C-alpha cells in the first residue's frame, strides 16, 4: 500500500503526494548502478533518447489510424536542455507519454523479465552498456544523477510527476507546472562530479556516437552570449530591468538577459539624429539539430563505411559490440523495398523465450516507422537477425490484421529469408567468423531445417558437426560426403548427450573398426532436425542406434553373418521368452565388436536420446509417450565370450534358472549403455550388490553380518538357488 502524504504549501488546493517502494529486484539493480564504478557512464543518454524514440514511434503509429491523437502536439521531436546554474540535464519528447498507472508500473513497482538477468550478467562481468537489451535502460540515469524527476502527459490522463533519489522509494503526484500538451520530460539532477554532461561539446559527442540514426530530430538547447549594439537609453533601460530581475526569482530561462560591458562607444547617424551607441552582451538560446543524417538504408551501400554500419547497428540494437555480418540490399520491380540486416556477435539471453515479443526488425513504410514486432516479417528461426525494412508499397495506415493478409509482406519475407541464407553462406567462407556464428546460432539453423521445408537443402549445407574422424574440428555434411568409402551408401549418425558419450558408444564400434565415419549429434534439437532431414545430396541419413543397420559387406562377410544367425537362433528365442514384452525381438547383431549386447529401436520410434528429451518435457502428453516410446530390440554379439558361454549354458540345460538371471542382467545393463533409463533401478542395484558379495566371497547367510545387511539381504536373495527356484527371479 502506498503511503500518502500531503504538502502544506498550497492553501487553495492541497496536492496529493503518494510514496511507493521500488520492487525488490529494481531496488537491488539501482543500488548496483549507484554503488559500483563504471567508466562508460555516458550510455545513460543513449538509453533515455532511445526510450523517447520508442514513445514517439508509439504515438506516430496510433496517429496513422486516428490522426486526432496528434491534436495535443503535431511535432514529433526530442529536445536536450542542459542548465549549468541548476546542474540539470533535461530530455523532453513529444511521444505518447505515460498515464499514472504506467508511471507507477513501468518505473518501479513491476520488475521486467530482464532485471534479474541483467544483474546476473553484470555480476558475471558484463558491460553496463548492455542495460538497454534487458529493458531496464531508464535506471542508467542514476549513473550520473542523484535525483531524477519525470514529468509526463498522456492523452488519456492528467499531467503527473514521478521523482526519486533512489533511496528505495519514489513519489508520484499530479503536476501543476507548465502544461506539456503531450509527452515526457526527464530531468536529471546531476551529481557534483558529473557536470561534464552539461557541456555542449560532450553532449554532441555522445549523440553522434550513439544516437545519430534516431528517426526524430534531436535538438540541443544551449544558452549562449552574443554582442548587440543598443543606444545609451536602451542600455540604461536594460540595466534597470536587469537589477529588478536579479531581485526577483527567475521565471524563465528562455528570456534573453542583457548585461552591460560598458566601454566601447561610437557615434552613428540613425534617422537623421546622432545617438550614442553601446555594445552589450545578450544571452540567447541556441538551438541545434544534432542528427541530420539521412537514413542509412536509403543510401548506396558502396558509399557507406564499416564504421557507419557499426554505429547504426549499435544505435539500432543498443548492443555494445560490433555486428558480425551485414547485408544491405534493395529489391526493385513490381515490388520495391530496401533492407539492412545484421547478424549480432552473440545470441541474446532470451533468444527462444516465446512469451517475449521480438522487436528485432523495424518495419518502415516510405521512411515512416510502422512497427518493430511484426511477426510475419521473418520466420522464428531467424529471430536473431536485426535490422530495418523500408517498403514503398505498403499503405501507411496498415493494421496488424491487414499485415497478416498482405501478399506484399509475404514477398518481402521470402526475400529476407533468401538474403539471410546468402549472408550465412558468405559467412561460411570465413572459417573463423563462421565458427563464432555457429557457436551462437546453430540451434536456429537446426530449427530452420525442422520448420522451413522450402529452404531445408540450403540450410543443411550450413550445418557443422563433430564426427568420429574430425577430432576437434566441426565439419559440414559436404565434407563428410567427400570422405565416404567407395561402397558406402549412407550417411551414418548417432545422437546423444555428449561427444565422449557417443564416441564410446557400443553402436559405433564396428563402423569405426571398418573406417566408416559417424556424425556425432549431441544437441537435443538435432533429434528434431534429423527427423526432417532425411537425406543430403542423395545419400540417406541413417541412425546407428536403430534396427536394420546396413553396413558395406562383401559376400564372404554376408555368408559368415548368416551362419552366426543360424548358430544363435535358439539362444535368441530363449532370451525373447525370458524378456517377454520388454523387447520386441532378439537378433544377432552386425554392429558390435567389444560389447556383448545393445538395445536398438524400431525405425520409426524414438531413439533413446529422444525418449530422454521427451521425458524431460514438463508439459508432455503421456499418451504420445505410450505409442512413440521406442519399441526395443535386443541385439547380441555372436563373437563375445559372454554370449557364447550363455549359448552353451542354455543349450546344455534350457531350464537352468541362472540363465534367466544372466539374461535379465544383460538386458538391464544394455539398456543403460544404450542410453535408456531403468524403470526399477533399485532391483538392478540389488542384483549388482549380490554379484559384488559373491565376488568378495561374502556368505549372505553369515550370522555375524550386521542387522542392516541382514535387513537388506531379506530383500536380496542370493544368486545361487535350490532346484525349485531362482532367487534372482524372486526379486523380480
From Swiss-Prot:
GO terms for cellular component: apical plasma membrane; axonal growth cone; basolateral plasma membrane; brush border membrane; cell surface; cytoplasm; cytosol; dendritic growth cone. It catalyses: ATP + H2O = ADP + phosphate + H(+). Residues 682-732 are annotated as: Required for homodimerization. One of its GO terms (biological process) is response to xenobiotic stimulus. In the resting state, through the dimerization of its C-terminal domain, HSP90 forms a homodimer which is defined as the open conformation. Upon ATP-binding, the N-terminal domain undergoes significant conformational changes and comes in contact to form an active closed conformation. After HSP90 finishes its chaperoning tasks of assisting the proper folding, stabilization and activation of client proteins under the active state, ATP molecule is hydrolyzed to ADP which then dissociates from HSP90 and directs the protein back to the resting state. The modification Phosphoserine is found at residues 231, 252, 263, 453, 476, 641. Residues 225-278, 700-732 are annotated as: Disordered. Residues 284-620 are annotated as: Interaction with FNIP2 and TSC1. Residues 9-236, 271-616 are annotated as: Interaction with NR3C1. The modification S-nitrosocysteine is found at residue 598. The modification Phosphothreonine is found at residues 5, 7. CDD domains: HATPase_Hsp90-like. Disulfide bonds: none annotated. A motif (TPR repeat-binding) lies at residues 723-732. The modification N6-acetyllysine is found at residues 58, 84, 443, 458, 489, 585. Residues 230-246, 256-268 have a biased composition (Acidic residues). The keyword Lipid biosynthesis does not apply. Residues 729-732 are annotated as: Essential for interaction with SGTA and TTC1. Molecular chaperone that promotes the maturation, structural maintenance and proper regulation of specific target proteins involved for instance in cell cycle control and signal transduction. Undergoes a functional cycle that is linked to its ATPase activity which is essential for its chaperone activity. This cycle probably induces conformational changes in the client proteins, thereby causing their activation. Interacts dynamically with various co-chaperones that modulate its substrate recognition, ATPase cycle and chaperone function. (Microbial infection) Seems to interfere with N.meningitidis NadA-mediated invasion of human cells. Decreasing HSP90 levels increases adhesion and entry of E.coli expressing NadA into human Chang cells; increasing its levels leads to decreased adhesion and invasion. HAMAP family: HSP90. The TPR repeat-binding motif mediates interaction with TPR repeat-containing proteins like the co-chaperone STUB1. Belongs to the heat shock protein 90 family. This is Heat shock protein HSP 90-alpha. It comes from Homo sapiens (Human). The lineage of its organism: Eukaryota, Metazoa, Chordata, Craniata, Vertebrata.
Amino acid at each position: 500500500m502506498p503511503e500518502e502524504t500531503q504538502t502544506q504549501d498550497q492553501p487553495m488546493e492541497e496536492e496529493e503526494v503518494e510514496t511507493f517502494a521500488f520492487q525488490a529486484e529494481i531496488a537491488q539493480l539501482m543500488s548496483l548502478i549507484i554503488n559500483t564504478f563504471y567508466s562508460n557512464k555516458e550510455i545513460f543518454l543513449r538509453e533515455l533518447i532511445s526510450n523517447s524514440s520508442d514513445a514517439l514511434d508509439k504515438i506516430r503509429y496510433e496517429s496513422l489510424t486516428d490522426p486526432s491523437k496528434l491534436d495535443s502536439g503535431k511535432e514529433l521531436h526530442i529536445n536536450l536542455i542542459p542548465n549549468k546554474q541548476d546542474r540539470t540535464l533535461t530530455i523532453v519528447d513529444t511521444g505518447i507519454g505515460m498515464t499514472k498507472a504506467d508511471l507507477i508500473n513501468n518505473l518501479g513497482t513491476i520488475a521486467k523479465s530482464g532485471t534479474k538477468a541483467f544483474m546476473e550478467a553484470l555480476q558475471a562481468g558484463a558491460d553496463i552498456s548492455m542495460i538497454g537489451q534487458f529493458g531496464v535502460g531508464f535506471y542508467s540515469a542514476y549513473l550520473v544523477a542523484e535525483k531524477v524527476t519525470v514529468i509526463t502527459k498522456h492523452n488519456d490522463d492528467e499531467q503527473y510527476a514521478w521523482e526519486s533519489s533512489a533511496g528505495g522509494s519514489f513519489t508520484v503526484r499530479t503536476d501543476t507546472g507548465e502544461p506539456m500538451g503531450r509527452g515526457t520530460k526527464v530531468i536529471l539532477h546531476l551529481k557534483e562530479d558529473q557536470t561534464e554532461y552539461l557541456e555542449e561539446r560532450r553532449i554532441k559527442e555522445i549523440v553522434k556516437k550513439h544516437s545519430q540514426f534516431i528517426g526524430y530530430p534531436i535538438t540541443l538547447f544551449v544558452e549562449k552570449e552574443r554582442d548587440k549594439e543598443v543606444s545609451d537609453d536602451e542600455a540604461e533601460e536594460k540595466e534597470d530591468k536587469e537589477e529588478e530581475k536579479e531581485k526577483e526569482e527567475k521565471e524563465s530561462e528562455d528570456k534573453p538577459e542583457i548585461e552591460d560591458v560598458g566601454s566601447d562607444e561610437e557615434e552613428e547617424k540613425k534617422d537623421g539624429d546622432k545617438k550614442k551607441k553601446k555594445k552589450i552582451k545578450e544571452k540567447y538560446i541556441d538551438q541545434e539539430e544534432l542528427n541530420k543524417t539521412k537514413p542509412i538504408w536509403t543510401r548506396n551501400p558502396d558509399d557507406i563505411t564499416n564504421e557507419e554500419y557499426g554505429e547504426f547497428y549499435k544505435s539500432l540494437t543498443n548492443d555494445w559490440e560490433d555486428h558480425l555480418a551485414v547485408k544491405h540490399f534493395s529489391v526493385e520491380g513490381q515490388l520495391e523495398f530496401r533492407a539492412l540486416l545484421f547478424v549480432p556477435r552473440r545470441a541474446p539471453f532470451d533468444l527462444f523465450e516465446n512469451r517475449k515479443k521480438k522487436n528485432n526488425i523495424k518495419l518502415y513504410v516510405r521512411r515512416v516507422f510502422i512497427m518493430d514486432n511484426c511477426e510475419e516479417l521473418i520466420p522464428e528461426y531467424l529471430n536473431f537477425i536485426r535490422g530495418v525494412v523500408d517498403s514503398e508499397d505498403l499503405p501507411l495506415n496498415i493494421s496488424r490484421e491487414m499485415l497478416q493478409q498482405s501478399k506484399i509482406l509475404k514477398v518481402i519475407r521470402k526475400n529476407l529469408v533468401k538474403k539471410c541464407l546468402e549472408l550465412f553462406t558468405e559467412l561460411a567462407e570465413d572459417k573463423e567468423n563462421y565458427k563464432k556464428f555457429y557457436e551462437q546460432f546453430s540451434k536456429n539453423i537446426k530449427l530452420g531445417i525442422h520448420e522451413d521445408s522450402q529452404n531445408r537443402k540450403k540450410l543443411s549445407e550450413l550445418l557443422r558437426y563433430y564426427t568420429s574422424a574430425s577430432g576437434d574440428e566441426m565439419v559440414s555434411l559436404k565434407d563428410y560426403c567427400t570422405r565416404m568409402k567407395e561402397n558406402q551408401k549412407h550417411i551414418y549418425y548417432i545422437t546423444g548427450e555428449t561427444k565422449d558419450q557417443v564416441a564410446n558408444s557400443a553402436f559405433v564400434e564396428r563402423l569405426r573398426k571398418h573406417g566408416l565415419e559417424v556424425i556425432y549429434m549431441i544437441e537435443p534439437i538435432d533429434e528434431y532436425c534429423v527427423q526432417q532431414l532425411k537425406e543430403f545430396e542423395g545419400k540417406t541419413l541413417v541412425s546407428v542406434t536403430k534396427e536394420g543397420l546396413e553396413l558395406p559387406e562383401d559376400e564372404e562377410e554376408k555368408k559368415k553373418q548368416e551362419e552366426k544367425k543360424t548358430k544363435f537362433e535358439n539362444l535368441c528365442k530363449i532370451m525373447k521368452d525370458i524378456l517377454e514384452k520388454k523387447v520386441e525381438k532378439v537378433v544377432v547383431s552386425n554392429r558390435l565388436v567389444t560389447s556383448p549386447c545393445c538395445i536398438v529401436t524400431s525405425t520409426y520410434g524414438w531413439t533413446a536420446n529422444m525418449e530422454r528429451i521427451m521425458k524431460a518435457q514438463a508439459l508432455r502428453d503421456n499418451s504420445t509417450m505410450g505409442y512413440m516410446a521406442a519399441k526395443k530390440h535386443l541385439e547380441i554379439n555372436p563373437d563375445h565370450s559372454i554370449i557364447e558361454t550363455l549359448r552353451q549354458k542354455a543349450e546344455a540345460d534350457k531350464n537352468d534358472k541362472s540363465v534367466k538371471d544372466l539374461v535379465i542382467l544383460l538386458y538391464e545393463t544394455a539398456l543403460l549403455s544404450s542410453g535408456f533409463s531403468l524403470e526399477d533401478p533399485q532391483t538392478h542395484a540389488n542384483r549388482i550388490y549380490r554379484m559384488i558379495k559373491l565376488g568378495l566371497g561374502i556368505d549372505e547367510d553369515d550370522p555375524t553380518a550386521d542387522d542392516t545387511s541382514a535387513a537388506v539381504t531379506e530383500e536380496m536373495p542370493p544368486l545361487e538357488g535350490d532346484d525349485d527356484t531362482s532367487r534372482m527371479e524372486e526379486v523380480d
